[in-house]
């Protein structure tokens, strides 16, 4: 009994471990070693960049061979996504920036592609990597890595600050922090505290929401594979995978919508 628990525990820990590289020592990091700021999860970086390149290749192919008369199935599918995202931007964004639609499209499709990696059998790619390349651990779901989701959220946060300052100037931006919601000099400390918390909570919630949902979904697949024999895993994994498709699309949609809303808020002119 103890040995069974030990094997199952090791299986779960193995699939939740990233392939890590230490930039300081230029060596691969073993799972039992202490982490540092200079350690990169290179499997998350590899798959996120690979999926981004896949998106660019498909978009470039469709743009190059698109036709007006009789569009193909791939072109029609891409145009459907573009129309959907463009409609969301027109409904929710009230500024004039031409960056928002391409950014929203990129965020939406990229997150869907990253989330979809969770539908691949959890042992398939790690076993291939171990057998052919000697890679000890491989985690293929980038959106279940807090570093990836935080990096995306921080980029959105940086754009928010940029547009806040571009729209209102530095003085206007600072004024919105210290004179809102209570337009009294005595309330400046309270206003500043409330606004800073409100501002910083946006990237935190944006990153943790995506990470939490995808991490929990990945963990359920691992638990199914770890506790059930191989011949009975499909009874739980197939229904969960079907339900998980909804989570994959929904989380990408929520991230995109919040990105549009946050950037729309940053285009409002502050009026004291």
Swiss-Prot record:
It comes from the Bacteria. GO terms for molecular function: proton-transporting ATP synthase activity, rotational mechanism. Pfam families: ATP-synt_A. Keywords: ATP synthesis, Cell inner membrane, Cell membrane, CF(0), Hydrogen ion transport, Ion transport, Membrane, Transmembrane, Transmembrane helix, Transport. The chain crosses the membrane at residues 42-62, 108-128, 140-162, 177-197, 219-239, 241-261. GO terms for biological process: proton motive force-driven plasma membrane ATP synthesis. GO terms for cellular component: plasma membrane; proton-transporting ATP synthase complex. It is a multi-pass membrane protein. It is found in: Cell inner membrane. HAMAP family: ATP_synth_a_bact (MF_01393). F-type ATPases have 2 components, CF(1) - the catalytic core - and CF(0) - the membrane proton channel. CF(1) has five subunits: alpha(3), beta(3), gamma(1), delta(1), epsilon(1). CF(0) has three main subunits: a(1), b(2) and c(9-12). The alpha and beta chains form an alternating ring which encloses part of the gamma chain. CF(1) is attached to CF(0) by a central stalk formed by the gamma and epsilon chains, while a peripheral stalk is formed by the delta and b chains. Belongs to the ATPase A chain family. NCBIfam families: ATP_synt_6_or_A (TIGR01131), PRK05815.1-1 (NF004477). This is ATP synthase subunit a. It comes from Blochmanniella floridana.
């Amino acid at each position: 009994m103890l040995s069974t628990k030990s094997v199952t525990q090791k299986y779960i820990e193995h699939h939740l471990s990233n392939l890590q590289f230490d930039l300081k020592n230029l060596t691969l990091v073993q799972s039992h070693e202490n982490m540092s700021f200079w350690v990169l999860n290179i499997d998350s970086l590899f798959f996120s960049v690979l999926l981004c390149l896949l998106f660019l290749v498909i978009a470039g192919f469709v743009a190059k061979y698109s036709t007006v008369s009789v569009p193909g199935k791939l072109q029609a599918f891409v145009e459907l996504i573009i129309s959907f995202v463009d409609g969301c931007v027109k409904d929710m964004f009230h500024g004039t920036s031409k960056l928002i639609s391409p950014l929203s499209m990129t965020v939406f499709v990229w997150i869907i592609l990253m989330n979809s990696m969770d539908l691949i059998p959890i042992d398939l790619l790690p076993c291939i990597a171990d057998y052919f390349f000697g890679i000890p651990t491989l985690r293929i779901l980038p959106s279940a890595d807090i570093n990836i989701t935080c990096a995306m959220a921080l980029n959105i946060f940086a754009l928010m600050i940029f547009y806040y300052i571009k729209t209102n100037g530095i003085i206007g931006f600072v004024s919105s922090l210290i004179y809102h919601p209570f337009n009294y000099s005595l309330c400046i400390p309270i206003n500043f505290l409330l606004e800073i918390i409100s501002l910083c909570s946006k990237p935190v919630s944006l990153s943790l929401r995506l990470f939490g949902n995808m991490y929990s979904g990945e963990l359920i697949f691992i638990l199914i594979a770890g506790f059930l024999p191989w011949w009975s895993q499909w009874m739980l994994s197939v229904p969960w995978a079907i339900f998980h498709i909804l989570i994959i699309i929904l989380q990408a949609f929520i991230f995109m919508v919040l990105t549009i809303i946050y950037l729309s808020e940053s285009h409002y002119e502050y009026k004291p």
